[in-house]
């Protein structure tokens, strides 16, 4: 009897144990990452040929304590290697693990290689050559703390390499994991199986091989036992012949069918090739088709199973499309696949909840470093009384109501950018802004007292409902998460896409960037204030401080300002402002752009202006600014500096976002200034619910 070890992906150990026992293995013992078992020589070959779940089959040779590199050398050399190798066989060493002595795996592998070579030369036998790429024998050494475990890898290449997939092709899941997913899906061979996001077809091919009794090792060309001295070619040929006979019989007798589709024509072509090389191409129909076009291939029965490994995203900007995809799949399953089973394997359990289906079973597994879950569902047959479940119904109804109200209003106003929803319902704490045919959903980060999983699920529901109600393509929705700011955090960079969208606001053409920054380049709540500046600017010299992207300057220029001066500390935003001005034909010496710390520039400037717009941050302690700034504390000092630049009869429009801001009217009077609050006049319909989003004042000489 041989003592053997079969390795597998984490989470599949019990499944592998059952498989090995069915092959005839005895004394099976599950450990993390694999199964120890025993069997005769025939079982060695059968486990290699027939295991769909094992990553590798190892023949343990011994262990040794490693307190020095000499211990490792002597421990390896103690094994009778001349009885392991055939004469002339090549070998390679795979070494993993480190300890205080062996701190480099390459060094560990070199010591093992030296010990093996010296074992031959000391017996005056030809030394075996190393072949790292295609060795006849693979020696595996795993060092854990002070113990090194030494084994022969009888598999050669990993057993997931069945021989039907082009090695150049990238597969999101290995074939061994795919086989486990099929086994856990609840699908019964002899019933239809469909994968609507099949990629290169791995799940369907593994299922078809299982259903037709085709051994996973049947198409492999190389094995790790070819140079093993104890290899029995006669028994191996018997095992191989039996597998070929069973495969022919299984294919001839199988009557059901498999269906695969994917939106990528290139991977569908690869899937067809893979299925043909696996010997089951005639059983699978592959189509180039988007999930949105998915239909039941057997509407009159029989019932089957939909099985897939849908995409998941690591970046926030990929989530809206994935949420829409899962929501759509859930609706299609309910509408067209009543009576079928559904099984999905995913690295994002939250996305699976977008299906709006209740799972009957779930399993955990590792896909490389990723923690994954597989959930199985039964889709109930629809009845005349069945009503489709609404996702975030209260939110969807409010958004629909707001859309009806604001869409017509915005069209009449001549604006393309407006707020559709502003945390109207406390449990759906987001802002939804429309920018032409794009939508930005901003989630206000939930408090720590809210369960993170529930908050994420609610956000997914919001996105699915937003896409559905507004009828937009998922790739036209941008998702952002923001903390509630004490001031504008306009300089936070989120990305590097550099994609700008041209929008109209009254008679102005403006550029927005929906993805690269926390803000978009256009503060929607200041829309009316900008229009007022345009109406006030004819024939005047206009100054815009803390100008951001210069949208207020554009309105002033279009309103007939004699000159405009735009000041901001950020070169990025000044260049953006220049593009906005150029877009509206506002070029030349009359339109200056100045990069400077606005507070320092204000103290040193000696020019005169008729109309000044200033929208400072609530608070700033930027390293690039000379002093910390607090708008409540420092607004009088600011007004003192502004007054010096204000021409007789001129006006300052002063705005800020400080909640509860109190204007020091007495202090203003001492400066010879008076203030008129115009906040309510500057709040448009879409911001009527949020009356503290900004405050705005007109300041003139008393």
UniProtKB/Swiss-Prot annotation:
The keyword Cytoplasm belongs to this UniProt entry's keyword annotation: yes
Q: EC number(s) in its UniProt entry?
A: 2.1.1.173, 2.1.1.264
Q: Which Pfam families match?
A: Methyltrans_SAM, RlmL_1st, THUMP, UPF0020
What is a single cellular component term in the Gene Ontology annotation? cytoplasm
Top-level EC class, please?
transferase
Any idea which UniProt keywords this protein has? Cytoplasm, Methyltransferase, RNA-binding, rRNA processing, S-adenosyl-L-methionine, Transferase
UniProt-listed CDD domains = AdoMet_MTases (cd02440), THUMP_AdoMetMT (cd11715)
The UniProt entry, under Gene3D superfamilies, shows:
3.30.2130.30, RNA methyltransferase domain (HRMD) like, Vaccinia Virus protein VP39
Positions of the THUMP domain: 43-154
State if rRNA processing is listed as a keyword. yes
Q: State the disulfide connectivity.
A: none
User: What compartments host this protein?
Assistant: Cytoplasm
Please list the reactions this protein catalyses: guanosine(2445) in 23S rRNA + S-adenosyl-L-methionine = N(2)-methylguanosine(2445) in 23S rRNA + S-adenosyl-L-homocysteine + H(+); guanosine(2069) in 23S rRNA + S-adenosyl-L-methionine = N(2)-methylguanosine(2069) in 23S rRNA + S-adenosyl-L-homocysteine + H(+)
Report the main location listed first in the record.
Answer: cytoplasm
Matching PANTHER family? RIBOSOMAL RNA LARGE SUBUNIT METHYLTRANSFERASE K/L (PTHR47313), RIBOSOMAL RNA LARGE SUBUNIT METHYLTRANSFERASE K_L (PTHR47313:SF1)
What function does this protein fulfil? Answer: Specifically methylates the guanine in position 2445 (m2G2445) and the guanine in position 2069 (m7G2069) of 23S rRNA.
* Protein name in UniProt: Ribosomal RNA large subunit methyltransferase K/L
Q: What is the lineage of its organism?
A: Bacteria, Pseudomonadati, Pseudomonadota, Gammaproteobacteria, Enterobacterales
List the gene name: rlmL
């Amino acid at each position: 009897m041989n003592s053997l070890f079969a390795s597998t992906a984490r989470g599949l150990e019990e499944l592998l144990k059952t498989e090995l026992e069915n092959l005839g293995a005895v004394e099976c013992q599950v450990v993390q990452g694999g199964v120890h078992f025993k069997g005769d020589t025939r079982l060695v070959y059968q486990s290699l040929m027939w295991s769909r779940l094992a990553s590798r089959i190892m023949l343990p040779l011994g262990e040794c304590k490693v307190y020095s590199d000499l211990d490792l050398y002597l421990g390896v050399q103690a094994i009778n290697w001349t009885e392991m190798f055939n004469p002339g066989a090549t070998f390679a060493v795979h070494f993993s693990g480190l300890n205080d002595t062996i701190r480099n795996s390459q060094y560990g592998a070199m010591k093992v290689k030296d010990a093996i070579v010296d074992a031959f030369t000391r017996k005056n036998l030809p030394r075996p050559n190393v072949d790292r790429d295609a060795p006849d024998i693979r020696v595996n050494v795993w060092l854990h703390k002070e113990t090194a475990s030494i084994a022969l890898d009888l598999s050669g290449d990993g057993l997931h390499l069945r021989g039907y997939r082009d090695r150049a092709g990238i597969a999101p899941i290995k074939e061994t994991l795919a086989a486990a997913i099929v086994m856990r899906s609840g699908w019964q061979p002899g019933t239809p199986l469909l994968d609507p996001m099949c990629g290169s077809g791995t799940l369907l091919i593994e299922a078809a091989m299982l259903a037709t009794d085709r051994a996973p090792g049947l198409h492999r060309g190389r094995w790790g036992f070819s140079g093993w001295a104890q290899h029995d070619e006669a028994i191996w040929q018997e095992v191989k012949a039996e597998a070929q006979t069973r495969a022919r019989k299984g294919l001839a007798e199988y009557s059901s069918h498999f269906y695969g589709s994917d939106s990528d024509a290139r991977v569908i072509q690869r899937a067809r090739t893979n299925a043909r090389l696996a010997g089951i191409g005639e059983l699978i129909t592959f189509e180039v088709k988007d999930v949105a076009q998915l239909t039941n291939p057997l509407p009159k029965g029989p019932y089957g199973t939909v099985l897939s490994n849908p995409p998941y995203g690591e970046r926030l900007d990929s989530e809206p499309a994935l949420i829409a995809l899962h929501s759509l799949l859930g609706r299609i399953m309910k509408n067209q696949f009543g009576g079928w089973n559904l099984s999905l394997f995913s690295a994002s359990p939250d996305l699976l909840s977008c299906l709006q289906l209740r799972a009957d079973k779930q399993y955990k597994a590792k896909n490389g470093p990723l923690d994954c879950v597989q959930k199985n569902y039964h889709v109930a047959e629809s009845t005349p009384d069945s009503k489709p479940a609404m996702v975030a119904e209260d939110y969807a109804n409010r958004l629909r109501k707001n859309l009806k109200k604001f869409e017509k209003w915005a069209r009449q106003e001549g604006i393309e950018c407006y707020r559709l929803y502003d945390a109207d319902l406390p449990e759906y704490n987001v802002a939804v802004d429309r920018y032409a045919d794009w939508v930005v959903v901003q989630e206000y980060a939930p408090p720590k007292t809210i369960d993170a999983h529930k908050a994420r699920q609610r956000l997914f529901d919001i996105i699915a409902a937003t896409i559905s109600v507004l009828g937009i393509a998922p790739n036209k929705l941008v998702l952002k998460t923001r903390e509630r700011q004490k001031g504008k955090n306009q300089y936070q960079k989120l990305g590097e896409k550099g994609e700008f969208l041209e929008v109209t606001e009254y008679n102005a053409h403006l550029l927005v960037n929906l993805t690269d920054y926390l803000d978009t380049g256009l503060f929607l709540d200041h829309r009316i204030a900008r229009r007022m500046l345009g109406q006030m600017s004819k024939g005047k010299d206009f100054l815009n401080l803390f100008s951001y992207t210069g949208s207020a300057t554009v309105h002033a220029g279009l309103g007939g300002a004699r000159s405009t001066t735009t000041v901001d500390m950020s070169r990025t935003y000044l260049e953006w402002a220049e593009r906005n001005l150029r877009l509206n034909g506002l070029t030349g010496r009359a339109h200056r752009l100045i990069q400077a710390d606005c507070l320092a520039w204000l103290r040193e400037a000696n020019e005169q202006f008729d109309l000044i717009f200033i929208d400072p941050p609530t608070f700033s302690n930027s390293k690039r600014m000379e002093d910390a700034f607090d708008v409540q504390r420092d607004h009088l000092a600011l007004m003192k500096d502004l007054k010096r630049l204000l021409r007789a009869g001129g006006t300052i429009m002063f705005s800020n976002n400080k909640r509860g801001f109190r204007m020091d009217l007495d202090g203003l009077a001492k400066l010879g200034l008076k203030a008129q609050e115009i906040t309510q006049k500057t709040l448009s319909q879409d911001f009527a619910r949020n009356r503290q989003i900004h405050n705005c004042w007109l300041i003139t000489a008393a």
